[in-house]
Amino acid sequence: MADPTPTPALPIRPGALQSIVEFILELDKLKGVSRKTRPLGLERYENSAEHSWQIALLAASLVHHAPKSADGESAIDLDRVIHMLLVHDIGEIDTGDTMVYVVGGWEERKAAEREAAERIFGLLPEPQGGHFLALWLEFEEGASPEARFANAVDRALMARPLAEIPLGWYPREIRFDDGQVLKGPN
């Protein structure tokens, strides 16, 4: 399935490369956003950049199990899914990680994350910045089969820390059997 909105080709304009460099330098801050889970076998918490990389590879590994089209091919555009997963947590640069099990305050957190995504993608020249923001919004809204698949992949890793209790979410007292695992806005 062809991507209906491919990444736009950009002419090299004065300042465009500088804008892209500023964007990439801003993205480096994602490495400093600590999440609430720890990598297997490590005492430290993972960061959002590591998370995005891991779920992009998980999506590539799982795409063969996604729904098929009439011709037997995957109905999911993997490139689009990977692009969504690489940008889905960009707003956390400004807002920090929000644990999906937090009850209440979702509207405020989502608004702050959107404002952050608009700021960060706004560092890029158009139409590229708008393209990345559109992918981010598509993921947030679950507005396509690709976005729903990407959201499922993102949430699939949430069960992993339960396999390593007490290192996982134990300090936050979250257990599989208390109904917390499925909480969140989506």
Can you say where each PLM-predicted feature lies in the sequence?
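Alpha-helical, largely C-terminal catalytic domains
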Residues: 1-186
